[in-house]
Amino acid sequence: MSKPNVAIIVAALKPALGIGYKGKMPWRLRKEIRYFKDVTTRTTKPNTRNAVIMGRKTWESIPQKFRPLPDRLNIILSRSYENKIIDDNIIHASSIESSLNLVSDVERVFIIGGAEIYNELINNSLVSHLLITEIEHPSPESIEMDTFLKFPLESWTKQPKSELQKFVGDTVLEDDIKEGDFTYNYTLWTRK
């Protein structure tokens, strides 16, 4: 079986690409949460599902009643884990490569955080796409951040919205979505 398509999906505050403060996201964007769920669960092939890969700290930050994330295979990475299928919905693995050897019937793989996983895997050749929700705020310096993406975006090409629409499928994509003081847009990037 061929390896599935691997994409990073993340919401980040421009211009510094901040993604968190004290282990939490410093915003609650209702439509962005819906987009995340729709994109990470949507499949086009029958009898397949998608996988979400996250670090152990991200897994632990999800309230227990919401774990595992439904309708997706949840892969939790930690250097201290042995590669092990826990049940039909959860896999523990020590690396992205070893986790992909344990999966079958997976259409797409989405890396969902946290920062250490994002910043390590951005340079992994398995990652072919970035789905970045670019968030703007009138005074971004007023939003407390202690966690940032270290993405070499000069090695990536931002795709037109039509390519994003093809990639995400049925999901309706608005422009300049406003929630509170935040404005955001969904973007797709591919390697140069």
Swiss-Prot record:
Entries under InterPro entries matching the protein: DHFR (IPR012259), DHFR-like_dom_sf (IPR024072), DHFR_CS (IPR017925), DHFR_dom (IPR001796)
EC number, UniProt record: 1.5.1.3
Domain of life: Eukaryota
GO MF annotations in UniProt: dihydrofolate reductase activity; NADP binding
GO cellular component terms given for this protein: mitochondrion
Keywords annotated in UniProt: NADP, One-carbon metabolism, Oxidoreductase
Enzyme class of the recorded protein, top EC level: oxidoreductase
Catalyzed reaction equations: (6S)-5,6,7,8-tetrahydrofolate + NADP(+) = 7,8-dihydrofolate + NADPH + H(+)
Pathway: Cofactor biosynthesis; tetrahydrofolate biosynthesis; 5,6,7,8-tetrahydrofolate from 7,8-dihydrofolate: step 1/1
Keyword Ribonucleoprotein (UniProt): no
Oxidoreductase listed as a keyword: yes
Domain (DHFR) ranges: 5-191
Binding positions (NADP(+)): 11, 18-24, 56-58, 78-80, 113-120
Any one GO BP annotation for this protein: folic acid metabolic process
Binding-site positions, substrate: 32-37, 72, 112, 118
Job of this protein: Key enzyme in folate metabolism. Catalyzes an essential reaction for de novo glycine and purine synthesis, and for DNA precursor synthesis.
Family statement: Belongs to the dihydrofolate reductase family.
PANTHER family named among the record's database cross-references: DIHYDROFOLATE REDUCTASE (PTHR48069:SF3)
Protein name: Dihydrofolate reductase
Organism field: Candida albicans (Yeast)
Lineage: Eukaryota, Fungi, Dikarya, Ascomycota, Saccharomycotina
